[in-house]
From Swiss-Prot:
Keywords: FAD, Flavoprotein, Oxidoreductase, Tricarboxylic acid cycle. It comes from Pectobacterium carotovorum subsp. carotovorum (strain PC1). It catalyses: (S)-malate + a quinone = a quinol + oxaloacetate. This is Probable malate:quinone oxidoreductase. Pfam families: Mqo. Coiled coil: none annotated.
Amino acid sequence: MKKLLAMFFCLTVVVNAPLAMAEDAKTTEKTTDVVLIGGGIMSSTLGVYLQELQPDWSIDMVERMDNVAEESSNGWNNAGTGHSAFMELNYTPDNPDGPINISKALEITEAFEVSRQFWSYQVKNGVLNNPHSFINSVPHISFVWGDENTAFLKHRYDAMQHSTLYRGMEFSDDPNTIKEWAPLVMEGRDPAQKIAATRMPIGTDVNYGEITRQLVDAMKTKSNFALHLNSEVRDIKRNADNTWSVTYADLKNGEKESVIKAKFVFIGAGGAALQLLQKTGIPEADLYGGFPVGGEFLVTENPEIVKRHMAKVYGKASVGAPPMSVPHLDTRIFDGKPVLLFGPFATFSSKFLKNGSLWDLIGSVTFSNVMPMTHVGLDNFDLVKYLIGQVMMDDDDRFASLKEYFPNAKKEDWRLTVAGQRVQIIKKDDDKGGVLKLGTEIVSSQDGSIAALLGASPGASTAAPIMLSLLEKVFKDKVATPEWQSKLKEIVPSYGQKLDGNIEMTNKIRSYTSSTLGLDYIEVKPE
């Protein structure tokens, strides 16, 4: 028996010695006020807010890549749409029995107006530079065909004209007019095909990667900000004093681990946010699971083609398709150079990040979310069927899809590019077991000391209002102070007000942001 105990003791020492040594190797590098996990549009937006609201707070940003904005915020990893609900038909679902509900569209439009104000303030204060490096006017067009879809689009247009936010939108079912708006879409099209389109001249194309880089560059000029690149967060633990210890590994230095102790932690790590949230142990994390969906685009840089299309043309999603999969033919602008993208085509990978691990999905499954995830799979057969169909597509299938929007397209002009990964939220539900949540959701601890952003579209375009909501949720007392209220209204002049229905305020805000960002402007007129 003694020999057995001795062997067990020795084995325990052998197994645990490396762990103990690793623990000893950790060093509490510093104590800080705020840790931002992830170097994307969300973390950078929150960081700038906090620097402007509370300049004395120290902030550390931890990013696993060798630069910021390398995952979903990177311009090539997303559609670059300034989501304003001008053309995205999924925000206004059809209702054959009554008026179309535009409430979700209004929510998206109001949110993007906040982003425009946030960016304008940063331009005025030298945080962002050269607005055309990150945002440009590109008309937003909805384009459909067939009796049912054209009737829906007219129905939608009529409903949206009752809102002051959509004045200036044009509707047409005349092929010649639509050809003026988007010539590539019309050339070579069957003249007998019934078509319709709406056009909003004040739409935008946005490079969220460029915004992120500029925001972080500005943050780096402050002495109480530190950026840790090539640093992967390995653990997040609550301390006895309700602070948090964030352990990260230096991927360029033998994965040496360091610890930062922080009063507040934000997990803005895109698809990786779910697994990091689960590491915190907060009960709120138990409500969530995630399902990854990737994307690919066809792209052309042929100048003869690109110069003849200056628009984002969105179609109608297939039944069961997620919002991010609405087909669109887009003008994109990178470093001043326009290109055309078409897609997205959904892909499947078990990775939660483009540069993630194939074990991400399996690693995120827990006792608390396995049943909600199962229920969502069973209840969303159309989505599963759609994804299978997308994954099975070959080059000919993708090109056939392109020709529905660009009939005269030639294969040799286009190449396939892989975009970023998204993780759709799956949330526990008392009635259904689990539901697939579209959009984004802030998850925070009860005491507000840690928060994460889960979900996908519209995402980046509404980073400023989403982070504003986070401030209101986790820094409620601070937001209520005269100092923060005054600064927030300076950053976002419409803070606390809705633009819809307020013509004077809408014109004032849009005129201000358009002139500051160098964008097209349309004065809103009474109905």
